[in-house]
A protein has these predicted regions:
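Structural recognition of the conserved hydrophobic beta-strand(s) that form the central parallel beta-sheet
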Residues: 98-99, 136
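Inter-motif core of Ras-like GTPase G domains
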Residues: 108-143
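Conserved G1/Walker A P-loop phosphate-binding module
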Residues: 2-98, 104
């Protein structure tokens, strides 16, 4: 995970019907920053989102605070789940889990240094069970990356 990800929130029960989205990318690609920006937009720009993003475990809120207060911490978690619920205006709410991942773990999966095993709590398991992957790429990274 990037150096900006906080310690994971206490495990919250994850709705089995939740949409599962994994932010996948190398270290410093901006995965945590995207989640922090989403939390900021949810707090200040609900109209632009056309709904309300509920963060029951307050994990995104903590991440946003760390990002905007510039309190960076290194974490060793392979994945950090952020359970949320999006309530579009006039529509039923949608449960989702946003997974932030460790860039080193992503690199190890891509270079096949880590097996693609479907185990709970691993990046491989999150990827294999995801409804969608959001690929974050650092455009300023060298081409060799």
């Amino acid at each position: 995970m990037s150096a900006l990800s906080p310690s994971p929130p206490p495990p919250a029960p994850i709705d089995p019907a939740a949409l599962r989205l994994v932010l996948f990318g190398m270290s410093d690609a901006g995965k945590s920053s995207l989640l922090g920006a989403l939390a900021q937009a949810a707090e200040t720009q609900a109209r632009a989102l056309h709904g309300h993003l509920n963060d029951p475990a307050h994990g995104l809120e903590e991440l946003r605070k760390k990002l905007y207060d510039d309190r960076q911490t290194e974490t060793q978690q392979e994945i950090v789940p952020y359970p949320v619920r999006f309530s579009p205006y006039g529509q039923p709410s949608i449960p989702a889990v946003l997974y932030d991942c460790d860039g080193k773990a992503a690199n190890e999966l891509l270079t096949q240094k880590r097996p693609m095993e479907n185990r709970e709590g691993t990046l491989a398991g999150a990827v294999l069970n995801a409804d969608g992957l959001i690929l974050a790429v650092d455009a300023s990274a060298p081409h060799s990356q």
